[in-house]
Amino acid sequence: MSESKRGGAQLARAVEKAYQAGQDDYHLEPMVLVENGKPVGKIGDGDAAVFCCRRGEREIELTELFTDPDFNKVQRNQLKDLDFVIMTMYHDKFKDLPIAFAPSHVVKPLAQVLSEAGKNQFHCAESEKYAHVTFFFNGGENAPFPGEDDVCVPSPKGIDFDQQPELSLPAVADQVMGALGKYDFVVTNFANGDVIGHTLNTAAKLEACKHVSHYLDVVVHDALAKGYVVAVTADHGNIEKLYTAAGKPDGAHTTNLVPFILMDPAHSGPIALRDGCLGDVAPTVLNVMGIPQPAEMTGKSLAEGHDFGKDRKMLLIICDGWGLGSGDDGDAIHLADTPYWDSLLAEQSWSKLHASGEHVGLGSGKAGNSEAGHSNLGAGRCVMQDDVRLDAAVKDGSFKKNPIFLQAIEHAKKNGTALHLLAYLTYKSSHGCIDYPLAICEMARDAGLDRVFFHIIFDGRSTEPGSAPKLLAELDEKLDAIGVGRIVDGVGRGV
């Protein structure tokens, strides 16, 4: 690859050397463009920066690094007069930052309806998925509703997740069983299907499936013995698909349907269930518990014809990244030793739910993700996701008129400084898309700002393994066509 004034070729060579040293895209160590012994494109006083990612998960910590004066997890210099823009509101602690696409609030999510009905509730997950059973499940609310207790179990630290495929599931199961009998509603997330599904380690995936099956057995039996109606479902697919069409290990989300299993210990016969989508789960919970469904919830109960009686309690288990696969040698759940899971499908009442694309407020044909999944599960309706709002803005031209972006560009122009774009190098991740920073780069060019620096986050999940050099070459060409912009550093998203 030849030298490039845009920096992509230089970064691509560094990536290829990292591959030779055994690194992959997800775990690429930081690499920086250097000229005359100095790093190029450092963020400095008076600059503007746009975090071109749309999810409120890993983005939170990096935003804290730049904006929170009390952040102390790493040593850093506090920059003066930095205009730091976030694409969406990753957390309500950032509500006073400039937000390009501020959230539309979910009115009357399940947790609020339960609270207003006088029911107490328990939300529990390990830290990798804690935000999903709280912030996302609760419609964007960070604070628990009255009567709601939230427990976060730390995920393993200092070790690659595929080396501990059970993650912290044993501790999560213990917390859930400790809550059963004390709360009217319990929701939990079993993270393994997604977290281990994102790795490329087939043996670890099979082991993860085994652990999920085992702890489903333990927790479900305890809940049924205590009189709880139990639902087991998923937020999207992932671990069930081991290989890409080219036969390579696959760590990406899928568009597969997900199961909805419902068990009522007070009823020995089958429960008539219909197929539906994730937005039908919250209405089902309300149906089970005998609580009127608010008009804001447009989903419908999946078990409308079943008489659950009065004063019922319910456990909802969300198996993250646990889709209905092909049932062959390319399906991890099928291959794994999962006797209890197999018995659920063989002996219990269950239906199929849509968990991707327009059914959960994503773009047509797009794989589901944890944020969309949990927001739909908790909202009881289809919740329009950020990628649809953003893509619509790009399509109708309003993206390039966004006043928050224009203010950031003007800030850099006024100070005679630079605009920095923090961006995922991918076209289809639920975290973001390289098209967003490219559009902002064009805006900067049109406004007469030529100092624009790209800070790349290598995805390693939605992209093919080893594809970073090719994607960097494509980005180089696009920046050449725009006429401004330089790629100055990169790091894997898992570092």
Question: Where are these predicted regions, by residue range?
Answer:
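Feature captures the catalytic ectodomains and active-site-proximal regions of enzymes
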Residues: 1-495
